[in-house]
From Swiss-Prot:
Record-linked Pfam families: CLASP_N
Gene Ontology biological-process annotations: cell division; establishment of mitotic spindle localization; microtubule anchoring; microtubule nucleation; microtubule organizing center organization; mitotic spindle assembly; regulation of microtubule polymerization or depolymerization; regulation of supramolecular fiber organization
Bias kind Low complexity: ranges: 284-296, 550-569, 603-618, 642-656, 665-679, 785-796, 1038-1050
PROSITE patterns according to UniProt: HEAT_REPEAT (PS50077)
PANTHER family: CLASP (PTHR21567), CLIP-ASSOCIATING PROTEIN 1 (PTHR21567:SF28)
Protein name: CLIP-associating protein 1-B
Basic and acidic residues bias: start-end ranges: 1121-1130
Molecular-function annotations in GO: kinetochore binding; microtubule binding
């Protein structure tokens, strides 16, 4: 009877030793016979149980014969299952580790052999050893010894390349101190074996491990003995890193023969690259300078792009789901002890999430920043598979996110650069391709210093690569991205031109011409600074180069040259360091590429010249004789405009190269047709530009001969005929551009009909016409008229040449979307043209198409080609939103936030106008409440850090939204409250008056939109926010009332129209508000039925309501509350406390009469009890939690601000002209860096006023004074800076409580003043800092100072420590205890500072701490060395003797 798995499982589980020994050999025979054990692989559960039984019952048996037999059975299983046994390794490994410590030598040897066999057949050495680290800490000393012996055996079988030895060496070092001598000896032997395979790096590594010198001496002696014995076995990866032949895994000049010599010499099997193909065999056609040249394992950009989508499909259900996925990925990647396959899976999952739309979630970029460390760790991994996947993922992130990947790119770039000299091809080429992809897609100026710093590397290979990267950067990036680092680029290129390596010099000369295209003036200065031999080399490089990228790009468009259009992404460098001329090779192979000159004007120009340049035998012959000043002919061809504002259309391409194989039929113009075209005027005004050398290789003569020449009086004579004519560039022997390719009369008729229809539609709808043309290229009317020649070039072409064929097939949406998603900017632009045509034809997109288009548009917001693609994208976006607005609700958040962010970018004025138009259309297309909620969410999002321009854009948008919203759209939610509180803080933005004004206008607009709801919202905010908003609203209402009394005709109601197109100008600061008339935003305020008395009554209601919600935040708001008429008169003082002293305060008694309802009938909720509730019967309702941020020493001040005096006497004590004086002083102080003497006088006057206790002045002007003073600290004149600090110090003395909300800003600015070069300013800053330390609450002060002490440089850290010392002298012991963990690290860091003054200040501060808390400080000083501790004790004793009245734990809390 034939036994199956069930039978053998029963035999394995039996306990009888005799039967086990009898059954064992039969089981081995069964397992090795595939016919008998055919069911072995069919039932995984039975197999798992069988392996588990063998590991626990047999291998762990106390009978050594059974243990040996168990290992033999496992060995048979490994032989049978091979790779499939890997899943069982975790089951058997613990038992095998235990057996390494068996008392029997035969068991230990058999165990070791089995482990080696598993490494070879079922797994690989690294996989196994990552799971065997626990053996180094095993409780059995024989096991610890056995693990070391097993490592020696592994090295002898597989070599050092198979293991990440850096992870194993620390475990071995720990065993050097093992209590057992056998283990210690085994550990030393292990290190010696590693030294045999790795070499001197082990010696250097051990020196850093902190081992005792005596032990190191023993080990190093053994190393020397091995070296002398001649038994060293060095692997290829361990050669000197400066060896040119082994450094660069991707050298362009390395021959294929050298690649074979560097093949890995490990015995282990090759591991698949993870993409289901072998390297070097993925493409049937050989690549130019491709894999054969790079060597086995090399990768290129094509491999990367294919691998981008080689990731499992995942779905993202929510932002929470995304966050959890990224957290798991970070956890795996941050720990290199995880299985390498898990780490590869984690890296692939990042790509999966990207493909699933992770970038659309708000929290993605915050989580991505947290992955920087994990990416760096993965890129440094010793396993090439992990490095490869890490590099692919980084490249994918860069290509998808573009400039949004700036932080990640900057973080990982140095690590990726370290891969370039790696001798392992797959690692070196992965690093190179990653850097190229990052340079192509992430145009961040901060990357430039990283690249240029590597241009001075000791490694020749790295220098060569860096200059190639620099060349690519100069081709791909726009000029504005490079401007910040012009000098660095120039200096780097200069070093490259002088480089010792000839190939590096060649590439550096190429970089020079790229640099010249961006910064011709600086390039010419660099040229003059070079020796004559180098100047000649530069000129001869330009003359002789076959490269089509050796010249600067037209308008920095890399894609406008043939180099970018025909280049596959994996374009390799030729041995000379230049790119192989692609146009020529393409023509010979017959694979025709689409010309892009129908999109870009400069590409059209080059295509024309390409055909014409064949007549000149030496196109660069005149360059060498040119002086540097004449290089303008080599630079960019710029589009110049006529005074009429129109520019001419571009010519179509020389030949249609869309891959059609049929014969080309060229349509010719008739003689005399349109020879007097109005476009002729354009060319005549642009003379004098000589034909510059072109970047396009000459077209073969057989190609040119197929293009018929225009004869006689044809339009060849028309100056508008070609782009070159229009720009006044002369050319020898021009030929006309080829017409569109038409294969039949049917095609011709269709093309004519389309051309006429397009022309007709453009004449009827002028605005629409622009959407078919690239930004900034508007044709003359003649070009688009119905009367144009049917066969003319312009009849077939839109502004940029031939209409792409899919424009006539509007149904082909997929092709349009594919073009829009292309990585080539010109294809993206072509796609946008097609999309505009689709939208114009009212072709509605399906839900799937909409989703994909939204994803594409999300990426386009970061498109780097602002002149070319982004501008057209904005035009298309407007049409898209108008047509599909009902289906875009889910995409509104991205749309709105991205447009607002773009308003903060440095864009051309015309592009910014298009962004504004897109915002206007968005505002009118979607529900207002939804937009408002999105904006509130965006404002409070902690991951967003909008710059000042973006803040202004957000605020202006909210203001315009509030004008059109219904009152019910404004909802008092927690998100809205947070957003409003942030807007209130923006009203004091120190860096921008625009932000301050815009924030004030928004608060007023929201107040006017829904007064009751906004009042309730304010009541729920902390008191500081309430005060700021209430004061602003009070001033607004007061000014509105004064203005409306002066010009009653201006008092109009709110505009009810939802689509109002009028936009209000920003409101000026309340203190500077004109009283003569209403600002546009004030006009909307509903004052139609209110006279002056009613407005004051309204104000009382508002302020009273705010006070109510402050003191009764826990009481049900709907509970009817009686108004106490006796206390109503107190509200009159609100006006006195908040209004401008210069305001007209007539009718003070009228204000307190009548007890009117607030604003309108909807505000009945605002009838509340007076603000002094906590002194009356309702005191029990006071909620201390709402005032938890108050500090005891400021309770009086807070009370004074919250409760106003009974009458207006306080204000009447202040002369009205006094406030005018302050306003004049502030106006004078705002003249920064001008009128020095006048401002000195103003500061002196302000110094006098600060010494007067004038509450009303400070109530109104404090913020403005403080901001102006802090701004004045950056003045050019040192005397003014010093004077500003003295005024600040005086205010600190007299008004300390007011600095509570500005402590951090004031402290930072004061400390920064210590860096001043003038002693007078530094002295004033020291005095101000000293006063600050005594004026601001100690705990608040220390919280600000601690991070400064830890991060700032000298002398700021010194000033901060001194200031902290003064603060500590006045803090209580209990409070100091709580913040001690924050204080001590910075002081210990200062104790180690290189500046002696910082060390001394740190010691004094520690002494001050000791004087407060005494011996309790000692535990925090454990890391101090003995000498430092002695010094500290010396100072402590000296302080105690100096102040004999104070004990070691004296309490100075009374000062606080």
């Amino acid at each position: 009877m034939e036994q199956g798995m069930d039978y053998w499982l029963g035999q394995i589980q039996q306990k009888d030793v005799g039967k086990r020994l009898q059954v064992g050999p039969d089981l081995i025979e069964y397992l090795l016979d595939r016919q008998k054990s055919i069911d072995l692989e069919q039932d995984q559960t039975l197999l798992d149980r069988m392996v588990d039984g063998l590991a626990t019952s047999w291998v762990n048996s106390s009978n050594y014969k059974v243990a040996l037999l168990g290992m033999d059975i496992l060995s048979a299983l490994v032989t049978r299952l091979q790779d499939r046994f890997r899943t069982q390794i975790g089951t058997v490994l613990p038992s095998l580790m235990d057996r390494l410590g068996d008392a029997k030598d035969s068991v230990r040897d058999q165990d070791q052999n089995l482990l080696i066999k598993i490494m070879e057949q079922a797994s690989n050495p690294q996989y196994m050893w990552e799971r065997m680290f626990s053996g180094f800490k095993h409780k059995n000393f024989r096991t610890r010894e056995g693990v070391c012996l097993c490592l020696i055996a592994t090295l002898n079988v597989y070599g050092a390349n198979s293991l990440t030895l850096s992870k194993i060496v620390p475990h071995i070092c720990n065993l050097l101190g093992d209590p057992n001598s056998q283990v210690r000896d085994a550990a030393i032997n292990c290190l010696v074996e590693i030294y045999r395979h790795v070499g001197e790096r082990v010696r250097a590594d051990l020196s850093k491990k902190g081992l005792p010198q005596s032990r190191l001496n023993v080990i190093f002696t053994k190393f020397d003995e091995v070296q002398k014995s001649g038994t060293m076995i060095l692997s290829t990866t361990d050669k000197n890193f400066d060896d040119e032949d082994s450094v660069d895994g991707n050298r362009p000049s390395s021959a294929s023969s050298s690649a074979s010599s560097k093949a890995p010499q490990t015995a282990r099997r090759g591991v698949s690259l993870g993409t289901g193909r072998r390297p070097g065999t993925s493409s049937a056609a050989p690549k130019t300078g491709g894999t054969a040249k790079e060597g086995a394992g090399a990768l290129d950009e094509e491999d990367f792009i294919r691998a981008f989508e080689d990731a499992p499909t995942v779905q993202i259900y929510s932002s929470r789901d995304l966050e959890e996925s990224l957290n798991k990925i970070r956890e795996i990647l941050s720990d290199d002890k995880h299985d390498w396959e898990q780490r590869i899976s984690a890296l692939k999952k990042i790509r999966s999430l990207l493909l699933a739309g992770a970038a659309e979630y708000d929290n993605f970029f915050q989580q991505l920043r947290l992955l920087d460390g994990a990416f760096k760790l993965s890129a440094k991994d010793l396993r090439s598979q992990v490095v490869r996947e890490a590099c692919i993922t980084l490249g994918h992130l860069s290509s998808v996110l573009g400039n949004k990947f700036d932080h990640g790119a900057e973080a990982v770039m140095p690590t990726v650069f370290n891969l370039v000299p790696n001798s392992t091809k797959i690692m070196a080429t992965s690093g190179v391709v990653t850097i190229r992809l990052i340079i192509r897609h992430t145009h961040v100026p901060r990357l430039i210093p990283i690249i240029t710093s590597n241009c001075t590397s000791k490694s020749v290979a790295v220098r060569r690569r860096c200059y190639e990267f620099l060349d690519l950067l100069l081709q791909e990036w726009q000029t504005h991205s490079l401007e910040r680092h012009v000098s660095v680029l120039a200096e780097t290129i200069k070093k490259g031109i002088h480089d010792a390596d000839s190939e590096a010099r060649i590439v550096a000369r190429k970089c020079y011409w790229g640099f010249h295209g961006h910064f011709s003036k600086e390039a010419e200065q660099l040229f003059h600074a070079l020796e004559s031999s180098y100047q000649k080399a530069l000129q001869s490089h330009l003359k002789n180069s076959d490269s089509i990228v050796s010249l600067p790009q037209s308008d920095r468009s890399s894609s406008s040259s043939q180099e970018s259009l025909n280049r596959p992404l994996s374009a390799k460098r030729s041995p000379t360091g230049s790119t192989v001329s692609r146009a020529t090779s393409k023509s010979t192979t017959g694979s025709l590429q689409r010309s892009r000159s129908d999109i870009d004007v400069n590409a059209a120009a080059t295509s024309k010249t390409k055909a014409a340049s064949g007549a000149s035998t030496a196109p660069f012959s005149s360059v060498a004789a040119l002086p540097p000043g004449s290089y303008a002919s080599l630079g960019r061809i710029r589009t110049r405009r006529q005074s009429s504002g129109s520019t001419t259309s571009t010519a179509s391409t020389p030949a249609d190269t869309r891959g059609r194989s049929r014969a080309k039929v060229v349509s010719q113009s008739q003689p005399g047709s349109r020879s007097s075209s109005p476009g002729k005027l354009l060319g005549s005004s642009y003379g004098g530009i000589a034909t510059g050398p072109q970047r396009v290789p000459q077209m073969p003569s057989e190609k040119r001969s197929k293009i018929p020449r225009s004869q006689g009086c044809s339009r060849e004579t028309s100056p508008s005929r070609t782009v070159l004519d229009r720009f006044g560039i002369s050319q020898p022997g021009r030929i006309p551009s080829a017409m569109r390719v038409l294969s039949s009369s049917t095609d011709l008729e269709a093309a004519v009909a389309d051309a006429l229809l397009l022309g007709d539609s453009r004449n009827k709808m002028k605005p629409v016409r622009r959407r078919y043309e690239p930004y900034g290229m508007y044709s003359d009317d003649d070009a688009n008229s119905d009367a144009s020649s049917a066969c003319s070039e312009r009849s077939y072409s839109s502004k940029n040449g031939g209409i792409p064929h899919y424009l006539r097939q509007t149904e082909d949406v997929a092709e349009v979307l594919n073009h829009c998603a292309s990585s080539n900017w010109s294809e993206r632009k072509e796609g946008l043209v097609g999309l505009q045509n689709l939208l114009k034809s009212q072709r509605l997109l399906s839900r799937v198409e909409l989703k994909r288009l939204c994803e594409i548009f999300t990426r386009m917001f970061a498109d780097p080609h602002s002149k070319r693609v982004f501008s057209m994208f904005l035009e298309t976006l407007v049409d898209f939103v108008i047509i599909h607005k009902d289906d875009l609700q889910d995409w509104l958040f991205i749309l709105l936030t991205q447009l607002l962010k773009k308003m903060g970018a440095d864009l051309l004025g015309s592009v910014q106008a298009k962004v504004q138009k897109a915002l206007d259309v968005t505002r009118d297309s979607f529900p207002f409440d939804q937009q408002f909620n999105i904006l509130m969410r965006f404002i409070v999002d902690q991951t967003q850090t909008p710059n000042l321009k973006v803040k202004v854009a957000i605020l202006k948008y909210i203001e315009s939204l509030a004008r059109q919203m219904d009152p019910t759209d404004f909802v008092n939610s927690s998100e809205t409250r947070l957003a409003v509180s942030r807007i209130i803080t923006w009203t004091t933005e120190p860096k921008s008056s625009d932000v301050r004004k815009a924030a004030q206008v928004v608060l007023i607009s929201l107040f006017e939109l829904n007064t009751p709801e906004f009042t309730m919202l304010l009541g729920a905010l902390p008191k500081t926010f309430q005060d700021g908003a209430t004061k602003l609203l009070h001033n607004h209402l007061k000014n509105s009332s004064n203005s409306s009394m002066g010009s009653p005709s201006n008092t109009i109601g709110r505009t009810p129209s939802r689509h109002s197109s009028s936009r209000a100008s920003p409101l000026t600061s309340p203190t500077n508000c004109s009283h003569g008339g209403l600002s546009p935003s004030m006009l909307d305020y509903d004052t139609e039925n209110l006279n002056s008395d009613e407005i004051y009554s309204s104000l009382r209601g508002v302020t009273e309501a705010i006070e109510k919600f402050s003191f009764r935040s826990q009481v049900d708001l709907n509970e009817p509350v009686r108004r106490d008429g006796k206390k109503e008169s107190e509200m009159g003082s609100c006006d006195a406390g908040m209004a401008s002293p210069a305001s007209d305060l007539r009718g003070g008694t009228d204000m307190v009469e009548g007890g009117r309802m607030a604003l309108d009938n909807k505000t009945s909720l605002l009838n509340t009890q007076p603000p002094r509730a906590f002194t009356g019967p309702r005191g029990r309702e006071y909620n201390p939690y709402a005032y938890s941020d108050s500090i005891n020493s400021y309770d009086k001040t807070a009370l004074k601000e919250a409760v106003f005096d009974d009458d207006m006497d306080q204000l009447r004590d202040v002369p009205i002209d006094h406030s005018d004086l302050v306003a004049d002083l502030l106006k004078e102080l705002s003249n920064h860096n001008e009128r020095v003497e006048e401002r000195k006088g103003a500061l002196c006057e302000l110094l006098k006023i600060t010494r007067e206790d004038n509450l009303a002045v400070w109530e109104e002007h404090f913020k403005t004074i403080l901001l102006l003073l802090l701004e004045t600290l950056g003045d050019k004149d040192h005397a003014i800076r010093a004077l500003a600090l003295r005024v600040l110090r005086e205010i600190l003395r007299n008004q300390p409580a007011r600095f509570k909300n500005y402590a951090e800003l004031t402290i930072m600015k004061t400390l920064e003043a210590h860096k001043d070069s003038h002693k007078e300013v530094v002295r004033a800053a020291e005095e101000a800092a000293s006063t600050l330390a005594g004026s601001i609450h100690p705990e608040q002060c220390i919280k600000v100072l601690c991070p400064i002490i830890q991060t700032a440089d000298y002398p700021i850290n010194l000033a901060a420590i001194k200031m902290q010392t003064k603060v500590i002298e006045r803090i209580s012991k209990e409070s100091l205890h709580q913040i001690l963990p924050d204080i001590i690290p910075g002081l210990l860091q200062g104790y180690d500072n290189t500046e002696s003054s910082v060390r001394k200040a740190s010691v004094f501060c520690l002494v001050a701490v000791y004087s407060v808390i005494g011996e309790e400080l000692k535990p925090y000083l454990a890391q101090l060395t003995g000498s430092k501790m002695k010094l500290l004790n010396l100072y402590i004793k000296r302080a105690q003797t100096t102040n004999s009245n104070s004990s070691s734990s004296s309490d100075v809390s009374t000062h606080s």
